[in-house]
A protein has these predicted regions:
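PLP-dependent amino-acid enzyme catalytic core
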Residues: 1-311
Length: 311
């Protein structure tokens, strides 16, 4: 019998899909291989680190039975933590900028989490500061700290990276991933680079907030990447190239994936695929396998400009 005893056991082992229609439409000679992380039970790649960070805190004796998990997040990590907390009997307090989509708020509340909103203009730093303030005044509480927690990239190194390597039979030429905490790129990238030192690693950040590429931060509409500060868990030395993506390009690409590939993916997925397509269009990558991370589902962005479609 193959029956899980906890929703946590359903996290990971997500599928990979080649975007054949997208390749043909855009006359790409490379293979775009998407790691579709919306297949996680909470709908995003962040389910992985939610479980990984909670388990690390439990093993370290920092998270005790009946304890409270507090986390600043742009949304998906909060949803994943709310899900894991519900399954393990913890209280979750999620701190999020009020500029994030209403669907994200509703999902966290549906899992039983308490939601604290901070001013969107303060970005993720405002949420981080508020989370630390709440932790100081809440008994038996911890901030798991995705931006600084080594369990974040370690989880991807232990799970996502090996899955990609196995599913491609080790034939990975390029990895393309957005930078939010940097944990996804760092964990997967370090694993792949160890297996093949020639793997090219491409980071994706907002055109309106090119902090990594130009040292300039600003407001933007690509929810989930571009935290406007450089996270501690990001290993910048792994990055070979940084591609900035405009909001309209991310939105348009996301809509195209839904309409022509049947994959309803989120804003940062659109951004990552657009960036991957720029790499794939280069003659030197003809015939190469370009792995692109699709962090979440588009269902949590239906109220945003991305899917503001006139009937």
């Amino acid at each position: 019998m193959r029956i899980a005893k906890s929703v946590a056991e359903l996290i990971g082992r997500t599928p990979m899909l080649e975007f054949t229609h997208f390749e043909q439409t855009h006359c790409l000679n490379a293979h775009l291989l998407a790691k579709v992380e919306s297949f996680n039970p909470g709908g995003s790649v962040k389910d992985r680190i939610a479980l990984g960070m909670v388990e690390a805190a439990e093993k370290a004796g920092k998270l005790l039975p009946g304890g409270t998990i507090i986390e600043p997040t742009s949304g998906n990590t909060g949803i994943g933590l709310a899900m894991v907390a519900a399954a393990r009997g913890y209280t979750a307090i999620i701190v999020m900028p009020d500029s994030m989509s209403v669907e994200r708020r509703q999902l966290m509340l549906a899992y039983g989490a308490k939601l604290v909103l901070t001013h969107g203009k303060l970005g993720m730093k405002g949420a981080v500061d508020k989370a630390n303030e709440l932790a100081a005044e809440t008994p038996n509480a911890i901030v798991v700290g995705q931006f600084v927690n080594p369990a974040n990239p370690a989880t991807h190194r232990a799970t996502t990276g090996p899955e990609i390597w196995a599913d491609t039979d080790g034939q990975v030429d390029v990895l393309v991933a957005g930078i939010g905490t940097g944990g996804t790129l760092t964990g997967i990238g370090s694993y792949l680079r160890e297996k093949n030192p020639n793997v090219r690693i491409v980071a994706v950040e907002p055109f309106s907030s090119p902090l990594l590429s130009k040292g300039v931060a600003g407001p933007h509409g690509l929810m989930g990447i571009g935290a406007n500060f450089v996270p501690d868990v990001l290993s910048r030395d792994l990055i070979d190239e940084i591609i900035t993506v405009k909001e309209d390009d991310a939105y348009r690409t996301g809509r195209e994936l839904a309409a022509h590939e049947g994959v309803l993916a989120g804003i940062t997925s659109g951004a990552a695929v657009w960036a991957a397509s720029q790499v794939a269009a280069r003659p030197e990558f003809a015939g190469k396998n370009i792995v692109v991370i699709l962090p979440d589902t588009g269902e949590r962005y239906l109220s945003t400009k991305m899917f503001a479609i006139n009937e």
